[in-house]
Structures are given as structure tokens and as C-alpha cells.
UniProtKB/Swiss-Prot annotation:
Belongs to the Fmt family. This is Methionyl-tRNA formyltransferase. InterPro entries: Fmt, Formyl_trans_C, Formyl_transf_N, Formyl_transf_N_sf, Formyl_transferase-like_C_sf, GART_AS, Met-tRNA-FMT_C, Met-tRNA-FMT_N. It comes from Francisella tularensis subsp. tularensis (strain SCHU S4 / Schu 4). It catalyses: L-methionyl-tRNA(fMet) + (6R)-10-formyltetrahydrofolate = N-formyl-L-methionyl-tRNA(fMet) + (6S)-5,6,7,8-tetrahydrofolate + H(+).
Length: 313
């Protein structure tokens, strides 16, 4: 395999894992692009992005432009490096055409969906929310559009019924390096393929989307909860408080035709609520300013029986 000079652009954990794996290959990482450092927490302590941490540990130069309009000098610095390829995954900063034109073999984007399905910001969450049974990693030749470039390689992944956005994210973090290295190996001869099919869009997640609609089926609610785990978290409103849900299971049919959203019963093992077709049991709940707890632990300090028969929403 030919040794390539690569510039890597990414910011969060998933990007950091791919970068770690890329360092293990024979390719040369010339520089890393990541978002600017952020002040976080009560003490406003400056934190580096996960990608920056990995780059510094490997003694690689790091560029952190606020934007390429505000920091045009970064483009010039990248041009001087004359990279063969720029690899991008979850960078989070818009790149201009001038950036895309720099590398010899173009810019490769690692996108975690089977394009053209779920273009955009939240492909993992939207795939689970929609009840998809499969997803994948696409290595895409970047162009000026939103995830519209030609496909160079694909790795398909099954979505299990127990997968959350966190577990699927972790799978992508481990598996994305395989199709990337395959693509880099054949970069001189690989034939880009235009995306086929009707595109769908994975719009950015909002905090308010976590609210559970119990008029939906138990399966739809399961998809909703798993899609929004860990963030923003799925929840229902009880006594004007947002109660986040944790572990759950789908039980028997709603044979008594209880109205969707009715709290059927509360046991030490769970909190049972009717959906449009079945009963769903929540084994864990999180009340405001509290930790996520098993129902048995909540019952030790809180009277929940008074809510039996109460209809949510």
C-alpha cells in the first residue's frame, strides 16, 4: 500500500477513535484540524477536543480555525503541506471549495449512514428513531453539497433492537477505519459512484424532541427512547416535572384498552404505562436534579402509588 500524506479533520470522540486507528497505519498524518478549544463547566476550564488530545499525544501540528473566512491563513498553511488526501469525520466547521481543491486525491468524508439516506447532522439518531434495521459507513468524495458527494466505499451494519445512539456510535467508532483504509489503498484506481435513491435528511436533534408520545406504538416508543439515549434523553411530564426514562421493556398487549399514557401499575420492578398497543415497563427513572435510579430505590423515598390510573399528556 502506498504511503499517503494525510490531513485529518474532526472533533468529537468518534473522530478521535478513527484518528487513533489511522496513526497505526503506515500513512503519514501531516496535521490535524479540529474545532477551537471550549471553556466548559462552572469553572469555565478550557477543554481540548478529543481529536486535539490524540493529535498532541502523537506530536502532530493542530490547526483550530474559528472558520476559514475568519482564519484564511490556515488554508495557506494547508496548501503548503501539499497533502495527498484530507480525511473528514464530524469536523463541525463548514469548509469552502478552496479547501476541497487542495489535496491531490480530494477530501474524503466518513459519513455514518447509507447515503443518500440520512444526510445531515444526526444520522445515528434518525436511523434508530425511524426503526431502520440497517445502517452503515460511507466513504464519500466531498463536494460543495450537504453529504451529496460520490461514494467510494461502504460498510453495512445491522441495527439491533437493543441498540441506542450510544452503542451504535461506539460501533461506528470501531468499524469506520476498515472502509477508510480500503479506500486509501485503492485511492488511485477506485471509481466514485453517484449516490442512488431518494435522499432523506437527519436534522439536528433538539432537547424538546425527547418528550415521549404514548399514543404511538410500543415499538415506536422503543425506537424513540433508544434514539435519544444518551442525549437529550427521552422523558415524560408528571406533575409538571420532566421525568427521564432509563432501562425499559415492552410487555403484554393492552388488552383492557387502557387509554394511551395511563399509568397502569407500579411495582418494585417497574413503572407500567399503556401505549397505543402494549404496556411498556420502565425499570429506571430519573427525577429532576436526581440520579437515574431503579424503581425499587425510588420507592424507598417516594410515594408513586398515588399516580396509578393517572393519564400522562
Amino acid at each position: 500500500m502506498k504511503k499517503l500524506n494525510i490531513i485529518f479533520a474532526g472533533t468529537p470522540d468518534i473522530s478521535a477513535q478513527v484518528l487513533k486507528d489511522l496513526y497505526k497505519s503506515q500513512h503519514n498524518i501531516q496535521a490535524v484540524l479540529t474545532q477551537p478549544d471550549r471553556a466548559k463547566g462552572r469553572g469555565k476550564k478550557v477543554q481540548f477536543s478529543p481529536v486535539k488530545e490524540v493529535a498532541l499525544a502523537n506530536h502532530t501540528p493542530v490547526f483550530q480555525p474559528l472558520s476559514f473566512k475568519k482564519n484564511p491563513e490556515v488554508l495557506e498553511q494547508i496548501k503548503q503541506l501539499k497533502p495527498d488526501v484530507i480525511v473528514v469525520i464530524a469536523y463541525g466547521i463548514i469548509v469552502p471549495q478552496e479547501f476541497l481543491d487542495i489535496p491531490r486525491y480530494g477530501c474524503l468524508n466518513i459519513h455514518v449512514s447509507l447515503l443518500p439516506k440520512w444526510r445531515g447532522a444526526a444520522p445515528i439518531q434518525r436511523a434508530i428513531q425511524a426503526g431502520d434495521t440497517k445502517t452503515g459507513v460511507c466513504i464519500m468524495q466531498m463536494d460543495a453539497g450537504l453529504d451529496t458527494g460520490d461514494i467510494l466505499n461502504t460498510l453495512e451494519i445491522e441495527i439491533q433492537e437493543t441498540d441506542t445512539s450510544q452503542t451504535l456510535h461506539d460501533k461506528f467508532a470501531k468499524l469506520s477505519i476498515k472502509p477508510l483504509l480500503e479506500t486509501l489503498e485503492k485511492i488511485e484506481i477506485i471509481k466514485p459512484e453517484p449516490q442512488q435513491g431518494e435522499p432523506t435528511y437527519a436534522h439536528k436533534i433538539t432537547k424538546q424532541e425527547g418528550l415521549i408520545d404514548f399514543t404511538k406504538s410500543a415499538w415506536q416508543i422503543s425506537c424513540h427512547i433508544r434514539a435519544f439515549t444518551p442525549w437529550p434523553g427521552a422523558y415524560f411530564i408528571l406533575d409538571d416535572e420532566a421525568i427521564k426514562v432509563g432501562e425499559f421493556e415492552i410487555l403484554y398487549q393492552n388488552t383492557d384498552n387502557r387509554k394511551a399514557g395511563t399509568i397502569i401499575d407500579i411495582y418494585r420492578s417497574g413503572f407500567d404505562i399503556a401505549t397505543s398497543d402494549k404496556i411498556i415497563r420502565f425499570r429506571q427513572l430519573q427525577f429532576p436534579n436526581k440520579k437515574m435510579l431503579n424503581i425499587v430505590d425510588i420507592l424507598n423515598g417516594k410515594d408513586l402509588d398515588k399516580y396509578i390510573g393517572y393519564k400522562l399528556g
